UniProtKB/Swiss-Prot annotation:
CDD domains: AdoMet_MTases. Pfam families: Methyltransf_9 (PF08003). Keywords: Transferase, tRNA processing. The gene is cmoB. This is tRNA U34 carboxymethyltransferase. The keyword tRNA processing applies.
Length: 353
């Protein structure tokens, strides 16, 4: 017997946007595009694995969840699982591999299912969170949100509504698998609309597909997160402008990206690959990135964290069995990538529109 997790989540997304459209007309454009966005991610002509991913989510068992902790480093869904349920959940969740962003835990005790993801995404969140101020009552957009781990943490931090976007068919279904167990535990208790009142939503699109408005007072978000995306963009300035266009005046951008050491004129443009990735285009210094943000109209730009990625934070696991950071570094000099570039270093900058 299949569950209705995705149907319910999509209905909740529609209801949330309908409510927003009463005060922010731009939301009507989101609503107009939503049927196509949600249809495309299930189209097997676009994504050969889409039917298998959908089946995995729809066949997750119904369990009695006692509590969901969105503030734990391991996003934990507390439930008493039988041995059979544990094995069933494990098998279905493994059909959604590789799991890159997490970690997650379903159940407790001997039968718990622990999804040990490639990234310790909790480490990044713990570095960033002290610098955010409050998310309480804020409307938040998470650009390139992957499996949704950070989006759930934003909801746990008090956001009134979180919209995660990422065009990945796999990541969309990973989010829906976790959503199946979270169910109504992220409900907005102050919501006056019909429906369950989910606070955390997922739209399988890229930033460039989102409607935007230059009209003051017609943007949807108080805070926009963009983490691990900028260096994949061929036009970083266009991307930064698109991020700014989603923010209300006075809104906050949280930008996390690869950086290199250097002055305001230092930008690395990898010749071919960087850490075996062929889609890395620009890696600026913090000073250069600060200048980029100011050039497109952000103010109060500050770097709040710089961290060299370790092989403990990003590594292969049973839930992501492909190559990981260790394989991307020079085996004789871990301060360099296999191509000879500086090893990955990430900075988080916060700016105001």
């Amino acid at each position: 017997m299949t569950n209705h997790t995705i149907t319910t989540a999509e209905r909740e997304l529609y209801l949330a946007l309908i409510q927003r459209a009463q005060y922010r007309p731009i939301a009507t454009q989101w609503l107009a595009n939503l049927p196509q966005w949600l249809s495309d991610v299930k189209d097997k002509r676009r994504y050969a694995h889409a039917p298998a991913y959908l089946s995995a989510v729809e066949n997750l068992p119904q369990i009695k969840v006692k509590n969901v902790d969105l503030n734990s480093d391991i996003l934990t869904i507390d439930a008493d699982l039988t041995d059979g349920q544990s094995k069933q959940i494990t098998a279905l969740m493994k059909q959604l591999m590789p799991w890159r962003k997490g970690p997650f835990q379903i159940g407790s005790g001997d039968n718990k299912v622990f999804i040990d993801t490639e990234w310790h995404s909790d480490w990044k969140w713990n570095r960033i969170k002290p610098h955010l101020g409050t998310l309480q009552g804020r409307y938040v957009l998470d650009v390139g949100g992957g499996s949704g781990y950070h989006g759930w943490r934003m909801a746990g931090a008090g956001a009134k509504q979180v919209v995660i976007i990422d065009p990945s068919c796999l990541f969309y279904h990973q989010f829906m698998a976790i959503r199946h167990f979270v169910a109504g535990f992220d409900t907005d208790m102050d919501s006056d609309r019909t429906g369950v009142g989910y606070r955390t939503h997922y739209i399988p699109v890229g930033l460039e597909q989102l409607p935007s408005s230059s009209d003051q007072g017609n943007q949807l978000f108080d805070t926009v997160f963009c983490m691990g995306v900028l260096y994949h963009r061929q036009s970083p300035f266009e991307h930064l402008i698109q991020l700014k266009n989603q923010l209300i005046n006075g809104g906050q951008l949280v930008l996390e990206t690869l950086v290199i050491e250097g002055d305001a004129n230092t930008v690395l443009v990898p010749h071919n690959r960087y850490a075996k990735m062929n889609n890395v285009y620009f890696i600026p210094s913090v000073a250069a990135l600060t200048g980029w943000l100011e050039k497109v109209g952000f103010s109060e730009v500050k770097c709040v964290d710089i961290d060299i990625t370790s092989i403990k934070e990003q590594r292969a696991t049973d839930w992501m069995s492909y190559q990981s950071l260790k394989d991307f570094l020079d085996p004789n000099d871990p301060t360099k990538t296999v191509e000879g570039y500086p090893a990955p270093m990430r900075a988080t900058l916060i700016a105001t529109k």
